[in-house]
Regions:
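Compositionally biased amphipathic helical and low-complexity segments enriched in hydrophobic
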Residues: 6, 25, 47, 60-63, ...
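Short, charge-rich amphipathic interface segments used for partner binding and complex assembly
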Residues: 30-69
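Small/flexible residues
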Residues: 14, 51-52, 76
Length: 79
């Protein structure tokens, strides 16, 4: 793994340890839990909610996905 990519992951992992990141994920989880499918009135709103949920899931899972990608890259370096 080159230095630039290593720094990218180190900075990302530092971000994940901050109170701000933890608060953001907690807020996103609350918003996600409050979305009710039965309140969706039309197809346009359904697709909008679907997009919102995808973004929320991406952010909620970003830490785990980043850690896995970093581990995979480290394994490639040792092979």
């Amino acid at each position: 793994m080159d230095k630039e990519l290593q720094q990218y992951y180190e900075e990302r992992f530092t971000m994940f340890t901050t109170k701000g990141w933890k608060d953001l994920v907690e807020d996103i989880e609350k918003i996600k839990d409050s979305i009710k499918v039965e309140d969706i009135q039309d197809e346009k709103t359904l697709f909008a909610r679907r997009g919102e949920l995808r973004i929320m899931n991406w952010l909620i899972n970003l830490k785990d996905v980043s850690e896995q990608a970093h581990q995979d890259l480290k394994k490639e370096d040792t092979v």
